[in-house]
């Protein structure tokens, strides 16, 4: 869905995107359902896990994205060390002819939480190598600042652990990250339903990245459309400016 004409597009590094909903491809039942969901979402940028994709294969995810004119964003999902992540990013650059990468370095398979030490190391190496790095990080304002200082083009704090659907567990930290950031803040992971996506935008995020909330919904295309509307609604509400919260009631019409 196109953004409101009065609102600017999402800008990351030297590129602009009309949609502020970034989709993932993991967990889809099949390519047909994934295609319906991607179209319904209006996304222009979609992540692809390089460890699960054969770039030279036949009609797969990459072919689908090309046909839909959606920019693929390779990610380093499954990597546990900086060395693994850097190698995966380099292979993705060769396979997809892009220096953009969603950087993931997780500490373990149980929590899938980012390993801050390995993540920062990988980010520094990839930025030095000329990559446009979008790191999946903890909801830690200090780490987010370190990643920005390292040269990352955006920071992508989690709302909750990947695939949990728990929503935004620490909204205050997300607000602190946004307040201090000089690059786009993209809420990544933990989204469960449309209200979570709207809240992310109301908190100040520039965009939302999600996969499981759509691909494992009962009706993925319908949920994708809901997420697109929610992201747009949250952004519009933020730009409009909410009323201040009050302890006592205040009539909207004269009482006498």
From Swiss-Prot:
- GO terms for cellular component: cytoplasm
Q: Which CDD domains does the record cross-reference, listed alphabetically?
A: ThiG (cd04728)
Q: Which domain of life is it from?
A: Bacteria
Q: Which reaction does it catalyse?
A: [ThiS sulfur-carrier protein]-C-terminal-Gly-aminoethanethioate + 2-iminoacetate + 1-deoxy-D-xylulose 5-phosphate = [ThiS sulfur-carrier protein]-C-terminal Gly-Gly + 2-[(2R,5Z)-2-carboxy-4-methylthiazol-5(2H)-ylidene]ethyl phosphate + 2 H2O + H(+)
Pathway membership: Cofactor biosynthesis; thiamine diphosphate biosynthesis
Ranges in coiled-coil conformation = none
Name a single GO biological process: thiamine diphosphate biosynthetic process
The reply to whether Transmembrane helix figures as a keyword in the UniProt entry is no
- The question of whether Cytoplasm is a record keyword is answered with yes
Keywords recorded for this protein, A-Z: Cytoplasm, Schiff base, Thiamine biosynthesis, Transferase
Active-site residues from the entry: 102
Q: What is its main location?
A: cytoplasm
Question: What EC number(s) is this enzyme filed under?
Answer: 2.8.1.10
Binding-site list for 1-deoxy-D-xylulose 5-phosphate: 163, 189-190, 211-212
Segments spanning the bilayer are none
Q: Which purpose does this protein serve, as stated in its record?
A: Catalyzes the rearrangement of 1-deoxy-D-xylulose 5-phosphate (DXP) to produce the thiazole phosphate moiety of thiamine. Sulfur is provided by the thiocarboxylate moiety of the carrier protein ThiS. In vitro, sulfur can be provided by H(2)S.
> What PANTHER family does the annotation carry?
THIAZOLE SYNTHASE
**What HAMAP family does the annotation carry?**
ThiG
Q: How does it assemble?
A: Homotetramer. Forms heterodimers with either ThiH or ThiS.
The name of this protein is Thiazole synthase
Taxonomic source organism: Nocardia farcinica (strain IFM 10152)
Q: Which gene encodes it?
A: thiG
């Amino acid at each position: 869905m196109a953004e409101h004409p009065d609102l600017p597009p999402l800008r990351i590094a030297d590129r602009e995107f009309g949609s502020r909903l970034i989709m993932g491809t993991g967990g889809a039942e099949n390519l047909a359902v994934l295609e319906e969901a991607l179209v319904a979402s209006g996304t222009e940028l979609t992540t692809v896990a390089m460890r699960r994709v054969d770039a030279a294969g036949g009609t797969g995810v990459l072919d689908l994205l090309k046909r839909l004119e959606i920019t693929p964003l390779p990610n380093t999902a499954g990597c546990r060390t900086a060395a693994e992540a850097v190698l995966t990013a380099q292979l993705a650059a060769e396979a997809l002819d892009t220096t953009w990468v969603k950087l993931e370095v997780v500490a373990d398979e149980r929590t899938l939480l980012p390993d801050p030490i390995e993540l920062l190391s990988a980010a520094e190496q990839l930025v030095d190598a000329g990559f446009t790095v979008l790191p999946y990080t903890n909801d830690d304002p200090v780490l987010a600042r370190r990643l920005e200082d390292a040269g990352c083009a955006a920071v992508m704090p989690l709302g909750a652990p990947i695939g949990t659907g728990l929503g935004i567990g620490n909204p205050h930290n997300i607000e602190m990250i946004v307040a201090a950031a000089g690059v786009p803040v993209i809420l990544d992971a933990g989204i469960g339903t449309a209200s979570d996506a709207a809240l992310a935008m109301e908190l100040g995020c520039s965009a939302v990245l999600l996969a499981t909330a759509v691909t494992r919904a009962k009706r993925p295309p319908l949920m994708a459309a809901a997420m697109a509307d929610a992201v747009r609604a949250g952004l519009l509400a933020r730009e409009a400016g909410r009323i201040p919260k009050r302890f006592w009631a205040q009539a909207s019409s004269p009482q006498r």
